[in-house]
């Protein structure tokens, strides 16, 4: 195991020997640096971010954290568009705090990023990507998740305008 610091991020490198293989498995963990002072709690003795910090990170992953110019010159953010992030936000929105309420506490660039995501994400690609996930809820319906998230973003837009 080795450790280094890149900017404010911490990076951990692990090398794990694999039985009957000449090559070792190399794993790296990169710490996201979104918070100056994240709220850390312990779960079975393991330090983890608070649920609110995790929610914030999931929104930042979907919305993006850096702005760029789009085709017509507008400043927009673009996140990683992963189905897993959308699913996690869906669960957090239903179990912790509705997304439209949580978004009000976030900086404007993340709010704009989620609205931009809502306007451009491919519903078809999202449904197909969700099929690849091992979702624990056997009654899960991708269409219902997408409609729920769309309605949360619409409600947020309605409340801030």
List each language-model region with its residue ranges.
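Compositionally biased terminal segments of proteins
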Residues: 1-161
């Amino acid at each position: 195991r080795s450790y280094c610091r890149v900017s404010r991020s911490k990076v951990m490198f692990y090398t794990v020997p694999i039985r009957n293989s000449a090559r070792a498995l190399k794993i790296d963990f990169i710490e996201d640096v979104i918070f100056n002072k994240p709220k850390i709690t312990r779960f079975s003795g393991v330090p983890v971010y608070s649920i609110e910090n995790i929610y914030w990170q999931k929104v930042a992953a979907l919305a993006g954290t850096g702005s760029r110019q789009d085709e017509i010159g507008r400043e927009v953010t673009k996140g990683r568009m992963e189905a897993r992030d959308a699913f996690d936000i869906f669960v957090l929105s239903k179990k912790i705090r509705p997304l439209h309420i949580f978004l009000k506490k976030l900086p404007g660039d993340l709010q704009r990023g989620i609205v931009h995501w809502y306007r451009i994400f491919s519903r078809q690609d999202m449904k197909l990507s969700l099929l690849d996930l091992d979702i624990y809820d056997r009654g899960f319906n991708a269409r219902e998740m997408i409609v729920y998230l769309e309605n949360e973003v619409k409600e947020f837009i309605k409340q801030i305008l």
